[in-house]
């Protein structure tokens, strides 16, 4: 379901624009659609036809994203296994400091070699209402003031739905534009569409290597764009929005943690409106990769930072419950597998 479909369903049961706006905001807050102001009953502000039609519609909206299981982590994050209306599963991650990582696809087609989500390929797209429903669901547990599109899927491959969700969250959803973070491997459509949007999110770009051939090997089905061109496109967007680009770099021991790569980062990012997020590799099943030792990570940060590239180590939230970067995949493969024989 897309957001306009949800709003049309409200109109179909007699809701006027003012009612639709009010009920949309209630939904975004994780509240019942007919919630009123303090000591105000639904009959005080909703037409009879809407009140009669809401129970069935509310069931349909609730089914967009149902919590199947919750897995709290020691760092205050929590991985949420979310069941969609058709029984497919995605994962959201509640982050410390009121953040939420949402999924935009069931599976992923990019197939990054260090990421679990793409192991099963792309199963289907999420509608914009299904994306927003993850936020509404999370807000039943805790406040959500930041939404990052870094869960399952490549947001650029579901661009219309993701941009619809971002627009609603950044207008009616009470989330600042800089706190909406669109993550991509570098699809050129992103750089065409995002500057045209009413809500322009912050942008995170998956870099991972300054060597074009190595980057293509790590992200085998990502657009074949040179790292230099990716950074220039990012810089143009950063200057237009006033938000620095967050460059993502999964640190892989013996692969992209060498001195040549560090000097390549300086060459590309020094003087740019950018933040380098170093993400030590998170362990997966049947690992072929490792993260560098802690001492080496500290050396890299000091080297880059002292030479003019703002560098942060992003120790992914929820690693102990497989909620960290690269670890997300639908545990529903097992759940659905158990269902099928019935």
Swiss-Prot record:
A UniProt-annotated Pfam family: Radical_SAM
Record: residues binding [4Fe-4S] cluster: 108, 112, 115
GO terms classed as biological process: rRNA base methylation; tRNA methylation
InterPro entries: Aldolase_TIM (IPR013785), Methyltransferase_A (IPR040072), rRNA_lsu_MTrfase_RlmN/Cfr (IPR004383), rSAM (IPR007197)
GO CC annotations on file: cytoplasm
Binding-site positions, S-adenosyl-L-methionine: 153-154, 183, 206-208, 282
Keywords: 4Fe-4S, Cytoplasm, Disulfide bond, Iron, Iron-sulfur, Metal-binding, Methyltransferase, S-adenosyl-L-methionine, Transferase
An example Gene Ontology molecular-function term: metal ion binding
Cofactor: [4Fe-4S] cluster
Domain of life the protein comes from: Bacteria
Active site (catalytic residues): 91, 325
Cofactor note: Binds 1 [4Fe-4S] cluster. The cluster is coordinated with 3 cysteines and an exchangeable S-adenosyl-L-methionine.
Record localization: Cytoplasm
EC number: 2.1.1.-
All residue ranges annotated as the Radical SAM core domain in the record: 94-320
Disulfide pairings: 101-325
Family under the similarity heading: Belongs to the radical SAM superfamily. RlmN family.
Name of the protein in its database record: Probable RNA methyltransferase PST_2231
């Amino acid at each position: 379901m897309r957001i306009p479909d949800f709003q049309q369903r409200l109109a179909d049961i007699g809701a006027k624009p003012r009612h639709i706006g009010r009920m949309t905001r209630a939904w975004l807050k994780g509240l019942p659609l007919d919630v009123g102001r303090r000591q105000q009953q639904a009959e005080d502000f909703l037409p009879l036809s809407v009140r009669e039609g809401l129970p069935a519609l509310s069931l349909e909206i609730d089914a967009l994203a149902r919590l199947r299981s919750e897995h709290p982590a020691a760092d205050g994050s929590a991985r949420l296994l979310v069941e969609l209306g058709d029984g497919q599963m995605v994962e959201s991650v509640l982050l410390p400091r009121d953040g939420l990582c949402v999924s935009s696809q069931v599976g992923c087609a990019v197939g990054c070699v260090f990421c679990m989500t793409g192991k099963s390929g792309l199963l289907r797209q999420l509608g914009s209402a299904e994306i927003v429903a993850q936020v509404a669901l999370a807000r039943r547990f805790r406040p959500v003031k930041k939404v990052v599109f870094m869960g399952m899927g490549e947001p650029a491959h579901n661009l219309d739905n993701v941009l619809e969700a971002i627009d609603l969250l950044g207008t009616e959803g009470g989330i600042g534009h800089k706190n909406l973070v669109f993550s991509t491997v570098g699809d050129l459509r992103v750089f065409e569409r995002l500057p045209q949007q009413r809500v322009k999110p912050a942008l995170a770009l998956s870099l991972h290597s300054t060597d074009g051939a190595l980057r293509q090997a790590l992200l085998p089905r990502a657009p074949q764009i040179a790292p230099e061109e990716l950074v220039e496109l990012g810089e143009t967007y950063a200057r237009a929005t006033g938000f620095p680009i967050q460059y993502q770099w999964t640190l892989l021991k013996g692969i992209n943690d060498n001195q040549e790569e560090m000097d390549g980062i300086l060459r590309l990012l020094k003087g740019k409106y950018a933040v380098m997020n170093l993400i030590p590799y998170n362990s997966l099943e049947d690992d072929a990769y490792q993260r560098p030792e802690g001492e080496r990570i500290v050396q890299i940060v000091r080297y880059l930072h002292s030479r003019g590239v703002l560098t942060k180590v992003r120790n992914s939230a929820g690693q102990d419950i497989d909620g960290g970067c690269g670890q997300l995949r639908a545990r529903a493969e097992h759940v659905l597998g158990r269902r099928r024989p019935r």
